[in-house]
Amino acid sequence: MSASLDTGDFQEFLKHGLTAIASAPGSETRHSPKREEQLREKRAGLPDRHRRPIPARSRLVMLPKVETEAPGLVRSHGEQGQMPENMQVSQFKMVNYSYDEDLEELCPVCGDKVSGYHYGLLTCESCKGFFKRTVQNQKRYTCIENQNCQIDKTQRKRCPYCRFKKCIDVGMKLEAVRADRMRGGRNKFGPMYKRDRALKQQKKALIRANGLKLEAMSQVIQAMPSDLTSAIQNIHSASKGLPLSHVALPPTDYDRSPFVTSPISMTMPPHSSLHGYQPYGHFPSRAIKSEYPDPYSSSPESMMGYSYMDGYQTNSPASIPHLILELLKCEPDEPQVQAKIMAYLQQEQSNRNRQEKLSAFGLLCKMADQTLFSIVEWARSSIFFRELKVDDQMKLLQNCWSELLILDHIYRQVAHGKEGTIFLVTGEHVDYSTIISHTEVAFNNLLSLAQELVVRLRSLQFDQREFVCLKFLVLFSSDVKNLENLQLVEGVQEQVNAALLDYTVCNYPQQTEKFGQLLLRLPEIRAISKQAEDYLYYKHVNGDVPYNNLLIEMLHAKRA
């Protein structure tokens, strides 16, 4: 699709352009653009009466090219085409994301087209020359306004003081300018340039990947065990008589849970603003320009909402986006969670006689139930989530509770697991062979799928910072229907995506595909969680899992 001009812009160009040409005196002396810029800088410190008026210049602005053809699916090894072998797509829907195919970079100082890396970052030729002359000539400018002049392509020459200040603010390096006035800069910023290029390439890949949104993702190709599949099919008719809405459940287990102080009703704290953060009345749209907000923009829209770029120092030894640091603050204290769950299980076992002792599967269900309590507590106290109203909180949790459980289990194995063992939430290592010898084949197959995912994530060097990002991406799913504040959910998802991308590129530069590989694990986690839900439902209908626990309440709420 060829580039085109908006009718109003074109008419404005004709009007001002022809007027400027008609009124231009024929005897006016014209300087080269470079000379004209130098003269303007020289006059910057003079009083107003000595300044020549700057004629208004109209510029023909070409709108960015928009691709009409949606990008293809991105495979795990970076090619376009079909999904990885262990995934299949049952149905999908294209979302019309507009994006510039070439992702043309704009100068962070004035917004003009960049010409390359100059003194620390991508800038245009004009700002490059201005910065070099200012530093080499040791110029000192003054601002006749309030030192906050707007600097853009059409006004960058009006106030050199504010222009130079913005050059420094956006990251141009004084030490990169050669003092000997020779051409070329100091070649000590090569690693930073290389990392920046890699980051931009990853962003391009993300944008293309986000151009295709899967409306529904099927399960992993490996089918569920035949006995589980047939059992689920056979119980559908019998299950129609089960209550699928919220029912009055016996409060015994909930009362004893160390994570709650009252019978569980999934009640969330009232809607309140985050302390220290601006309210989320606006998030950028999903258009390409705002999907990765320019940290240097000073427009009102860009200043609203939470920006992970704040305080993000790319030159630190291990760069961590500020948003990820905030997400880490929300993480529960793991030893405390372990102690609470262990105390609960010991109390539970002591209240039973020898004949009523829990089976291996029953004990694992109790652990999962208490882990789910801790996950709900984590969500309730987390940044962004507590900004949502209770109804939206309920919908998000009911949608992803099983995925969060699976992700929690998998990360625990990646971080603490040992070869041939399963690391339980209680902090104990149990032999893998011991568990599979006391549970059914269907459960063992689910455990095997999870362990395969553990191996893949270990090979990616999956760490806690990436784990918290994936948790928030799972929790803030824009696929949930009837959300009142969908804009906030989408905005959080976009910002966490961007923070995760920056983190992986800056901290794992040797793994160029890590970001994409991590995102590809999310559909696999969802597929495993779906099978786990079906298995849990099957066991529940057979009477192996009681009603009075959070697992079953959430299971019924999701199926309602």
Curated annotation (Swiss-Prot):
* Covalent link location (Glycyl lysine isopeptide (Lys-Gly) (interchain with G-Cter in SUMO1)): 289
Q: What cellular component terms from Gene Ontology apply here? A: chromosome; cytosol; nucleus; RNA polymerase II transcription regulator complex
* Short sequence motif named FTZ-F1 box, residue ranges: 189-208
Keyword Nucleus among UniProt keywords = yes
Processing and modification events after translation: Sumoylated by SUMO1 at Lys-289 during the hepatic acute phase response, leading to promote interaction with GPS2 and prevent N-Cor corepressor complex dissociation.
Instruction: Region AF-2: list its residue ranges.
Output: 547-558
Q: Record's CDD domains?
A: NR_DBD_Lrh-1_like (cd07167), NR_LBD_Lrh-1 (cd07069)
List the residue ranges of the region (Disordered).
21-55
Q: Where in the cell is it found?
A: Nucleus; Chromosome
Q: Which UniProt keywords apply?
A: Activator, Chromosome, Developmental protein, DNA-binding, Isopeptide bond, Lipid-binding, Metal-binding, Nucleus, Receptor, Transcription, Transcription regulation, Ubl conjugation, Zinc, Zinc-finger
Write out the ranges of the annotated region (C-terminal extension (CTE)): 173-188
Output the SMART domains linked to this UniProt entry.
HOLI (SM00430), ZnF_C4 (SM00399)
For domains, the record's comment is:
The C-terminal extension (CTE) loop competes with a DNA minor groove anchor of the nucleosome and releases entry-exit site DNA, thereby promoting opening of closed chromatin.
**Protein name as catalogued:** Nuclear receptor subfamily 5 group A member 2
Organism whose genome encodes this protein: Mus musculus (Mouse)
